Amino acid sequence: MEERIVSLLRPELITEAAHHWNATGKAVLLDDVSNFVYEFSSQDMRRILRLTHSSHHTEDEIIAELDWLIYLIQNGIPASQPILSQDGRYTERYPTGESYFVATAFEYAPGHFIDKTDPREWNSQFFRTFGRIMGRMHSLTKHYNADHLRQKRPHWYEDVILQRAEDYLPAEQRWVAAEVEKLLAQFGQKMPTVDSYGLVHGDVNPTNFHVRDGQLTLFDFDDCSYNWFINDIAVAMPLYSDMFAEEGWEARLTEFFQQYMRGYEEENHLDESWLEILPDSLRLQCLINLIACHASNVPNSRYRSFYELVLKIAQQGHPFFTYNFRGAYESAL
């Protein structure tokens, strides 16, 4: 998180926001990379409080996020339900000079982060369920209409991370911005259709869902934007997994991808030709993550080890960047 934003978040603002959702006790900080995320209790129930600075998302953008999230939940997507404040609103606004924070609250996702070392959790059945949920979201988003909102969610290429890449990167990493520009131009040549482009979560990975008894509950829709479906799939791939340092990683990756796509195809069809550019999409996601790390001051935070991993992959490459995803998919048919 940028230091100037941290300095704006007064302790009494956190207390006031939690009070709007009938908090009892102290709100405990869980995360402070893009938003300030807290856990609190209300009526003996675990809840999540999120405080977002207006420089990250406006209140209308957050309302658009919640509108889509509620639509997905109403149509069967397992996700953390937004909670109305005691004043009957999904968002509460707190001015801080010329800017403001927006508070939102959610039900706590049941379960825990998935244990990728436990074969009882990280297995073919889970991979298929994971893909099925993603396919269902892509199918549902084709029918979602946001025309009733004051402001829609942004398109992915409008993200400040991409618009100001060179401003965030240190001089020795400016090459990243040039490569991102080339990849953006490649996607810019594609013609968006309802079957390939729409409003997507944008950050479905093991840090943004909980599991319990094999069932997933998604959360953190903060990055949702209008984007290519293939980019949404790329984020779900285990790019930063430890498996690639072990023997037999290719067989495990193939199992993951084939089962994931089998589940995906149960709910939505994506033309196989998109799988040919999945390596480029994964490369792009890695570079975007690197820029985002600098934008959120991650190199100087407790998440520095993640930044170092992303930088290493950006500099040295990754097996994903040459993997034959289409071939793996077609061999599973």
Identify the residue ranges that each predicted region occupies.
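All-alpha amphipathic helical-bundle segments outside canonical DNA-binding/catalytic cores
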Residues: 125, 270-282
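Active-site catalytic-loop/activation-segment of kinase and kinase-like phosphoryl-transfer enzymes
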Residues: 149-190
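ATP/Mg2+ or Mg2+-diphosphate-binding catalytic cores
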Residues: 288-333
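Conserved NTP-binding catalytic cores of kinases and kinase-like/nucleotidyltransferase enzymes
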Residues: 1-87, 213-215, 329-333
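A glycine-centered beta->alpha junction motif in the catalytic cores
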Residues: 54, 88, 105-119, 159-167, ...
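ATP-binding pocket architecture of kinase catalytic cores
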Residues: 42-144
